[in-house]
Amino acid sequence: MAISGVPVLGFFIIAVLMSAQESWAIKEEHVIIQAEFYLNPDQSGEFMFDFDGDEIFHVDMAKKETVWRLEEFGRFASFEAQGALANIAVDKANLEIMTKRSNYTPITNVPPEVTVLTNSPVELREPNVLICFIDKFTPPVVNVTWLRNGKPVTTGVSETVFLPREDHLFRKFHYLPFLPSTEDVYDCRVEHWGLDEPLLKHWEFDAPSPLPETTENVVCALGLTVGLVGIIIGTIFIIKGLRKSNAAERRGPL
C-alpha cells in the first residue's frame, strides 16, 4: 500500500511519572508512558502504555480489545478498551479544532533511521529472526516490506505498534523468522513521508573468512620455533643436571 496524503498528527499525550525533565529533586527509577494519537487523513489512531521503553499493552481499535505485549501481563492487570476508544474520539475532535487554528498546517516529516540485525548469532540452517528497527521518525506512518532475493515475504512476519520516544519521535520493530543460508539475501524496505524514495537495508550471510595460507604458515613456523626452543632449553637443563650429579659422585662423601 503506497503512502499518500498530507498527515496531520493528532492529539499526542505523553504522561511521564517522575520524569527526568521535571524540576523535582528526585532521581527517577522507572518511567511509565501513556501515548495516544489520531491521524488524518488516515483516520487511524493508537493508544498504548510503555514501561521503561517496553510496551505493556495497546488497544486494537478495529477489534476494540486490549492486546497485552506478553500474555502474562494480563493475569496481573486489566484495562478496558472502551476507555481508550473514548480518548481517541476526544483526540479526533481536538484535532479538528487544532487543524483549523493552525490554518491546516501539516506536520513536519522526520525521516526514519533503519537498521537490520538478527535476534541471535547466525548459524547456517539454524532458525533465527531478522529484525528491522525503524527509529527517530514522525509522523507514525510507515510501510514496511520484507524481501527475500528481491521478492516480498509475508509468511510469519510480525511487528510492534508505534513506540514513543522521549524526544516525541517514534520507533518501531518488524520481525521476519528465517533460516540463514548462503543462497538467500534479505532486504527491509521502508516507505515514509520523510523519504524521497523507499529505503532498503540489506542483510546476507557473511561466512567467517578462513585464515590465508601465509598466516597459517606463519602460525606453524612460530609453533615449530617455540617447540625447538623448548627442546633446546630442556636439553641444556638436563646436561647441567647430569654434570652436577657427576661432580658430586667424583667428590664422594665428606
Swiss-Prot record:
Its main location: membrane. Residues 110-203 are annotated as: Alpha-2. Changing residue 242 to V: In allele DRA*01:01. Residues 26-109 are annotated as: Alpha-1. SMART domains: IGc1, MHC_II_alpha. Expressed in professional APCs: macrophages, dendritic cells and B cells (at protein level). Expressed in thymic epithelial cells (at protein level). Residues 240-254 are cytoplasmic. GO terms for molecular function: MHC class II protein complex binding; MHC class II receptor activity; peptide antigen binding; polysaccharide binding; T cell receptor binding. Changing residue 93 to L: Decreases the affinity of the interaction with TCR by more than five-fold. It is a single-pass type I membrane protein. The keyword Glycoprotein applies. GO terms for cellular component: autolysosome membrane; cell surface; clathrin-coated endocytic vesicle membrane; early endosome membrane; endocytic vesicle membrane; ER to Golgi transport vesicle membrane; extracellular exosome; Golgi membrane. GO terms for biological process: adaptive immune response; antigen processing and presentation of endogenous peptide antigen via MHC class II; antigen processing and presentation of exogenous peptide antigen via MHC class II; antigen processing and presentation of peptide or polysaccharide antigen via MHC class II; cognition; immune response; myeloid dendritic cell antigen processing and presentation; peptide antigen assembly with MHC class II protein complex. Residues 1-25 form the signal peptide. Residues 204-216 are annotated as: Connecting peptide. Changing residue 79 to A/C: Increases the interaction with HLA-DM complex and peptide exchange. It is found in: Cell membrane; Endoplasmic reticulum membrane; Early endosome membrane; Late endosome membrane. Induction: Up-regulated in dendritic cells upon maturation. Glycans are attached at residues 103, 143. Keywords: Adaptive immunity, Cell membrane, Cytoplasmic vesicle, Disulfide bond, Endoplasmic reticulum, Endosome, Glycoprotein, Host-virus interaction, Immunity, Isopeptide bond, Lysosome, Membrane, MHC II, Signal, Transmembrane, Transmembrane helix, Ubl conjugation. Changing residue 121 to S: Decreases the interaction with HLA-DM complex and peptide exchange. It holds the Pfam family C1-set. Belongs to the MHC class II family. An alpha chain of antigen-presenting major histocompatibility complex class II (MHCII) molecule. In complex with the beta chain HLA-DRB, displays antigenic peptides on professional antigen presenting cells (APCs) for recognition by alpha-beta T cell receptor (TCR) on HLA-DR-restricted CD4-positive T cells. This guides antigen-specific T-helper effector functions, both antibody-mediated immune response and macrophage activation, to ultimately eliminate the infectious agents and transformed cells. PANTHER family: HLA CLASS II HISTOCOMPATIBILITY ANTIGEN, DR ALPHA CHAIN (PTHR19944:SF86), MHC CLASS II-RELATED (PTHR19944). This is HLA class II histocompatibility antigen, DR alpha chain. The gene is HLA-DRA.
